[in-house]
């Protein structure tokens, strides 16, 4: 007999060589019917797994969050099975679960069409309703390679041949379809009920542009119809808010082929950019940061010394000149260390908080570029805090408070923190890591945050905090970071004189709140759906006259607004007033100042706020005061 421990603390005895499914059935038939996979000693396994030793067991159903990835992986296999039935000449390659769904890559001469997706999805529904049994099989490596070659699946044969010797070769069979997979999977295809195929894209085999192009089908799958419908509704809303679409409509920016991944900022977009920079500059000055500016083009010797050349060479833009190799900086940190090293630093100078709106360049693959979210030229709201080890907690608490203030000002209050601790391969002793991790944990707790742990995901040079925002339609965006670094000060020979008179290495805290300004503006465009708050809007007040004989007064109003720092636009054309209001509303301008005969006589304006039909009559001085008060809260 073996002892099996359950999540409720109970321990029950079972005969040896019992399966997880049989245990579930012994507990209740309803649990066995709903069961998808088993968690045995913390590891997910198929329900068919034979248990022959004492263990901890948890039976998982579709209600458990861990099963969402199982459902999506099952859906990927179901997609491949449907494709093979409909298009037998197609070769299958890989199909993992990803965030919010899955994909499967196929090799075929003819691209899939939108009509093909509809047919494939219908076939998937049919196969799901068949509720085919899914079974796991252990194969000999050579036989598996020969088998897949014999059925024309050369990509699968190549994958199996590349698996390290000694690793088991497991295949999963459902109906007439068989696939290489580690698993686990649900016991039958019927668990995949709520899914949709989304799109087709190209993808290189093994992600290498030198290899052949494959056809990638993206899909989404969920545990319930309500979850699927909610996700599709969110995508529909996200499409309306797409920053690339709104960027064109609101005349904020554009991209073009001659400068891939580089933003052409238009007047209104550049206004938003500069306003955000002005806002951040005010915040960091109040929090004791200095601001610096470092070169964009730096000799590769610095990047070699810092370690970036070895790790990021392929992502850097480099050029040869005067027998030297120069590189556009992909990040600011090595340059900030150079400033820190100018002159002798004492413990009294610490902490030293050094910020920069640093222009960086990264050679992103053209296929990875995505509007403002993924660019090749970017400016980070970057800062580095040089401090002593005993100052880490206080500096982290201070940063967390600053970050919270900034996010709140932009309307983000749902902030999640991820804590990445020591990886297996790392610099520094366990004692150093213990102190560093404890300092960050203590700081996060003092700042009032809960955190989730990403075990082993820290950089080799220190633990890391990531700050994730949730937007208006439920999407999550990782923006802020705080990365501790023991290594770069050592590599670049940065030091300070301690109170004892000895030289010590400072700890370096890499930190950003927005990340890149480009990406954060993209997030804001989608968060606000283009309706920027008054202080941030590129045009704060638009002036519209009812008749042309009021134009002189309108120009007087505009001059008064501009003289007081209000960003304005105006329309004094002969067009009808309703047309003018509609046009300004479509441009999502927060305040429209309508001027009629009465407003001219009383030196007033009739204010209509975006999204309302109500009008508020204000003097020009009152209007200026309203906008100024809003601006002064932030700028």
UniProtKB/Swiss-Prot annotation:
Cellular component terms per the entry's GO annotation: cytoplasm
Co-factor remark: Binds 1 zinc ion per subunit.
Superkingdom as given in the UniProt entry: Bacteria
PROSITE patterns listed in its UniProt record: AA_TRNA_LIGASE_II (PS50862), TGS (PS51880)
Keyword Protein biosynthesis appears in the UniProt entry: yes
Main location: cytoplasm
GO MF annotation: an example: ATP binding
Domain TGS, chain residue ranges per copy: 1-61
Transmembrane segments: none
Metal-binding keyword on record: yes
Keywords: Aminoacyl-tRNA synthetase, ATP-binding, Cytoplasm, Ligase, Metal-binding, Nucleotide-binding, Protein biosynthesis, RNA-binding, tRNA-binding, Zinc
Region (Catalytic) residue spans: 242-533
Matches recorded under Gene3D superfamilies: 3.10.20.30, 3.30.54.20, Anticodon-binding domain (3.40.50.800), Bira Bifunctional Protein, Domain 2 (3.30.930.10), Threonyl-trna Synthetase, Chain A, domain 2 (3.30.980.10)
Cofactor: Zn(2+)
A single BP term in Gene Ontology: threonyl-tRNA aminoacylation
Known partners and oligomeric status: Homodimer.
Homology family: Belongs to the class-II aminoacyl-tRNA synthetase family.
Name of the protein in question: Threonine--tRNA ligase
The species this protein was found in: Rickettsia conorii (strain ATCC VR-613 / Malish 7)
């Amino acid at each position: 007999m073996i002892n099996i421990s359950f999540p409720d603390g109970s321990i029950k005895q079972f005969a040896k060589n019992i399966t997880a499914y049989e245990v579930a059935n012994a507990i209740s038939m309803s649990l066995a019917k709903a069961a998808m996979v088993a968690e045995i000693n913390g590891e997910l396994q198929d329900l068919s797994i034979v248990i022959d030793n004492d263990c901890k067991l948890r039976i998982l159903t579709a209600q458990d969050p861990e099963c969402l990835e199982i459902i999506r992986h099952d859906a990927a296999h179901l997609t491949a099975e449907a494709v093979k039935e409909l298009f037998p000449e197609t070769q299958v390659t890989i199909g993992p679960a990803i965030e919010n769904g899955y994909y499967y890559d196929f090799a075929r001469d003819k691209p899939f069409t939108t009509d093909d997706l509809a047919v494939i999805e219908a076939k998937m529904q049919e196969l799901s309703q068949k509720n085919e049994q899914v079974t796991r099989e252990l194969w000999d490596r050579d036989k598996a390679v020969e088998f897949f070659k014999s059925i024309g699946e050369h990509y699968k044969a190549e994958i199996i041949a590349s698996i390290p010797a000694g690793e088991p070769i497991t295949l999963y069979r459902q109906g007439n379809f068989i696939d290489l997979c580690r698993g686990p999977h649900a016991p039958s295809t019927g668990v995949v009920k709520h899914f949709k195929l989304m799109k087709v894209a190209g993808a290189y085999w093994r992600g290498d542009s030198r290899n052949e192009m494959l056809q990638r089908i993206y899909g989404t799958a969920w545990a319930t119809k309500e979850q699927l419908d909610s996700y599709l509704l969110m995508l529909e809303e996200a499409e309306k808010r797409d920053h690339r679409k709104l960027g064109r409509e609101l005349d904020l920016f554009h991209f073009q082929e001659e400068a891939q991944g580089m933003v052409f900022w238009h007047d209104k977009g550049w206004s938003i950019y500069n306003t955000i920079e002005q806002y951040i500059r005010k915040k960091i000055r109040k929090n004791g940061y200095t601001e610096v500016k470092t070169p964009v083009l730096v000799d590769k010797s610095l990047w070699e010394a810092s370690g970036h050349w070895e790790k990021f060479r392929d992502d850097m833009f480099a050029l040869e000149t005067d027998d030297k190799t120069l590189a556009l900086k992909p990040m600011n940190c090595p340059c900030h260390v150079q400033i820190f090293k100018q002159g002798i630093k004492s413990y009294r100078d610490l902490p030293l908080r050094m910020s920069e709106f640093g222009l960086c360049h990264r050679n992103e693959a053209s296929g990875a570029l995505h509007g403002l979210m993924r660019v090749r030229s970017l400016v980070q709201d970057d800062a580095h805090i040089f401090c002593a080890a005993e100052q880490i907690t206080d500096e982290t608490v201070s940063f967390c408070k600053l970050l919270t203030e900034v996010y709140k000002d932009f309307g983000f209050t749902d902030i999640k923190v991820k804590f990445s601790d020591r990886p297996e391969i790392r610099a520094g002793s366990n004692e150093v890591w213990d102190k560093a991790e404890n300092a960050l944990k203590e700081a996060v707790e003092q700042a009032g945050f809960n955190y989730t742990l990403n075990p082993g995901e820290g950089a080799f040079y220190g633990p890391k905090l990531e700050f994730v925002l949730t937007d208006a339609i439920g999407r999550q965006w990782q923006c802020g970071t705080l990365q501790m670094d023991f290594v770069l000060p050592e590599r670049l020979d940065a030091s300070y004189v301690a109170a004892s008179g000895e030289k010590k290495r400072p700890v370096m805290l890499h930190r950003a709140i927005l990340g890149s300004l480009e990406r954060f503006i993209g997030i804001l465009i989608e968060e606000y759906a283009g309706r920027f708050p008054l202080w941030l809007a590129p045009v704060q007040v638009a002036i519209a006259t009812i008749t042309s004989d009021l134009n002189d007064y309108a120009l007087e109003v505009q001059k008064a607004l501009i003289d007081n720092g209000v960003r304005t636009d105006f329309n004094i054309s002969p067009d009808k007033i309703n047309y003018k209001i509609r046009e300004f509303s479509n441009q999502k301008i927060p305040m429209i100042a309508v001027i009629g005969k009465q407003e001219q006589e009383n030196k007033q304006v009739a204010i209509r706020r975006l999204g309302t039909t109500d009008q508020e009559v204000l003097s020009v001085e009152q209007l200026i005061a309203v906008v100024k008060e809003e601006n002064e809260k932030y700028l």
